[in-house]
């Protein structure tokens, strides 16, 4: 009996119903709530699990390299990146007979394969990989790192190698090592790789371990570094006629500031990127020596925070007390980390398409669309998670005595003002944006499109002009040839930048108009409403006027019975749950906007977006309906084609999504009655009644059913859009 699942909770293990299984799974990672947990074991478990996480990541990336080397067409793709379709891996067992085999045999393969829309081919090519052997050795190296990570994780669970709590709470040492080691040495090493391997590779030189020490990355070697003539490293860059991967038109520079894109690959100059990474490395190596550890020099973070008291008195005691609050709360730290990572992931989405770093990726339209959408959805989940852990911090870790009148306490003190302002902003954005869209819909329906309300985004256009975009006719900053900013950069990076920003074939500073203005505000509505729900959930997590003792009920509770009247739906978990729907909704609008604008750009008919995006029917008809035709035609009486799998996934995604509502709309009582009826039938059916269960079947709790519903809604929503996106883009552009 003692070994029943879950072993971490004897109370749950003795539960006679199926609740034991579901609650066991739900709390498996909530180490804080486990029996016999101590602060020391909590920190050590989390630390060891990080190594397991790393092992999984290394194994997964190793698998990418291995399968492309084994079943892909990397070597033939390298010969002609623009016309050969990159293969991700083979399809072992194509169903649906000969038509399926023919439909999926492409990219020069002998049998059915999947095409890669992840951009790994472009990435590996840019960083200097050229042969299948290179890919295999990369896969082996990552496999080795994966094994090392597993060993390290196991090692740090052994008594002798378990770090103490004081080691985990040594913030200065951790910051120094992460800043210098992670963000300093890593970019420095990457600069080294770019300079020694990738840049020579882009100029037709094949540098590997066997000739690594013989090939000079720069004709003058380290001379300019030691004599202080660093500008020599920037002289003689690749010419605009350079053919990537060959010596034709190649220069000798290794660290440049050219600006703009390589004309052939439409990606940032490798020498610019090497320079960028060197600068980042320098900054963080310095930053990693700022905090006081063994030698009594440098800053103490506690002293810094305690000194942050604005003299005006309008922020009370400022940051006093924050050091211990943050350093003793894993949820606070996780919230900060997730907030940062979420923002960075969204920035990755924005920059991967506008400033592509990998050779030829800008011309692989389906990959561009897939990467943008992927990173925006990931960012959404990570950002909502930040607020979830912020709320858990307020419930489990926040100590009012330690934080009297500091910025954290003052956030709680004026939460009504914060929440009501967010509410006002959301209402304003929602009603005005919908009002404009609906007005325009009605005008088109009545045949008077000239009566639409179309607002030019003049402030955004002015900002684009300030960065050098000339098409709007604003004579300002970098688009004004007489300004000091223009003249200062003219000799170095500006020509490349101006050329790129005014070139209409890339995605840098796209021309915007009334359709962009409207969808921008629709997205702003989604962002503000999501933020409102999340912020309210965190700030009301400890208590509210309606339920002052809320923190005593924990992070997720369904209600406090009928007696209090109206305590359903107000736990911090419920706020997270509602916010995820809004987050998905908002990112839907973001990705619709990005995809439609780019489809029209790539097809050369931007007027379709400009004319149809100003009213809702335009979005429904000319984006969603028009582009789903490939999916609806994925299989027909004439047999299969290569889009059939996406057509099936589109249907399957809708099915998963719709299943979510089964959990979201009907509550416990309905399911409990149904379960009891089914159990009755089971016990009275011959043969079936030979199978017994140890746990009495009961319905999911309200909170659990919501989680299951939300999971199906989210997964179905993303599956459906992924199939739509890839099929509609690859169906047009291959």
Curated annotation (Swiss-Prot):
<feature type="binding site" description="axial binding residue">
    <location>
        <position position="654"/>
    </location>
    <ligand>
        <name>chlorophyll a B1</name>
    </ligand>
</feature>
<keyword id="KW-0813">Transport</keyword>
<dbReference type="GO" id="GO:0051539">
    <property type="term" value="F:4 iron, 4 sulfur cluster binding"/>
</dbReference>
<dbReference type="InterPro" id="IPR006244">
    <property type="entry name" value="PSI_PsaB"/>
</dbReference>
<keyword id="KW-0793">Thylakoid</keyword>
<keyword id="KW-0560">Oxidoreductase</keyword>
<keyword id="KW-0004">4Fe-4S</keyword>
<comment type="function">
    <text>PsaA and PsaB bind P700, the primary electron donor of photosystem I (PSI), as well as the electron acceptors A0, A1 and FX. PSI is a plastocyanin-ferredoxin oxidoreductase, converting photonic excitation into a charge separation, which transfers an electron from the donor P700 chlorophyll pair to the spectroscopically characterized acceptors A0, A1, FX, FA and FB in turn. Oxidized P700 is reduced on the lumenal side of the thylakoid membrane by plastocyanin.</text>
</comment>
<feature type="transmembrane region" description="Helical; Name=IV">
    <location>
        <begin position="273"/>
        <end position="291"/>
    </location>
</feature>
<keyword id="KW-0411">Iron-sulfur</keyword>
<keyword id="KW-0150">Chloroplast</keyword>
<feature type="transmembrane region" description="Helical; Name=I">
    <location>
        <begin position="46"/>
        <end position="69"/>
    </location>
</feature>
<feature type="binding site" description="axial binding residue">
    <location>
        <position position="662"/>
    </location>
    <ligand>
        <name>chlorophyll a B3</name>
    </ligand>
</feature>
<feature type="transmembrane region" description="Helical; Name=II">
    <location>
        <begin position="135"/>
        <end position="158"/>
    </location>
</feature>
<keyword id="KW-0157">Chromophore</keyword>
<dbReference type="InterPro" id="IPR020586">
    <property type="entry name" value="PSI_PsaA/B_CS"/>
</dbReference>
<dbReference type="GO" id="GO:0016168">
    <property type="term" value="F:chlorophyll binding"/>
</dbReference>
<dbReference type="GO" id="GO:0009522">
    <property type="term" value="C:photosystem I"/>
</dbReference>
<keyword id="KW-0603">Photosystem I</keyword>
<keyword id="KW-0148">Chlorophyll</keyword>
<feature type="binding site">
    <location>
        <position position="671"/>
    </location>
    <ligand>
        <name>phylloquinone</name>
    </ligand>
</feature>
<keyword id="KW-0408">Iron</keyword>
<keyword id="KW-0472">Membrane</keyword>
<feature type="transmembrane region" description="Helical; Name=X">
    <location>
        <begin position="643"/>
        <end position="665"/>
    </location>
</feature>
<dbReference type="InterPro" id="IPR036408">
    <property type="entry name" value="PSI_PsaA/B_sf"/>
</dbReference>
<feature type="binding site">
    <location>
        <position position="670"/>
    </location>
    <ligand>
        <name>chlorophyll a B3</name>
    </ligand>
</feature>
<dbReference type="GO" id="GO:0000287">
    <property type="term" value="F:magnesium ion binding"/>
</dbReference>
<protein>
    <recommendedName>
        <fullName>Photosystem I P700 chlorophyll a apoprotein A2</fullName>
        <ecNumber>1.97.1.12</ecNumber>
    </recommendedName>
</protein>
<feature type="transmembrane region" description="Helical; Name=VII">
    <location>
        <begin position="417"/>
        <end position="439"/>
    </location>
</feature>
<keyword id="KW-0479">Metal-binding</keyword>
<feature type="transmembrane region" description="Helical; Name=V">
    <location>
        <begin position="330"/>
        <end position="353"/>
    </location>
</feature>
<dbReference type="InterPro" id="IPR001280">
    <property type="entry name" value="PSI_PsaA/B"/>
</dbReference>
<dbReference type="GO" id="GO:0015979">
    <property type="term" value="P:photosynthesis"/>
</dbReference>
<keyword id="KW-0934">Plastid</keyword>
<feature type="transmembrane region" description="Helical; Name=VIII">
    <location>
        <begin position="517"/>
        <end position="535"/>
    </location>
</feature>
<feature type="binding site">
    <location>
        <position position="559"/>
    </location>
    <ligand>
        <name>[4Fe-4S] cluster</name>
    </ligand>
</feature>
<feature type="transmembrane region" description="Helical; Name=IX">
    <location>
        <begin position="575"/>
        <end position="596"/>
    </location>
</feature>
<feature type="transmembrane region" description="Helical; Name=III">
    <location>
        <begin position="175"/>
        <end position="199"/>
    </location>
</feature>
<feature type="transmembrane region" description="Helical; Name=XI">
    <location>
        <begin position="707"/>
        <end position="727"/>
    </location>
</feature>
<dbReference type="GO" id="GO:0009055">
    <property type="term" value="F:electron transfer activity"/>
</dbReference>
<comment type="subunit">
    <text>The PsaA/B heterodimer binds the P700 chlorophyll special pair and subsequent electron acceptors. PSI consists of a core antenna complex that captures photons, and an electron transfer chain that converts photonic excitation into a charge separation. The eukaryotic PSI reaction center is composed of at least 11 subunits.</text>
</comment>
<keyword id="KW-0812">Transmembrane</keyword>
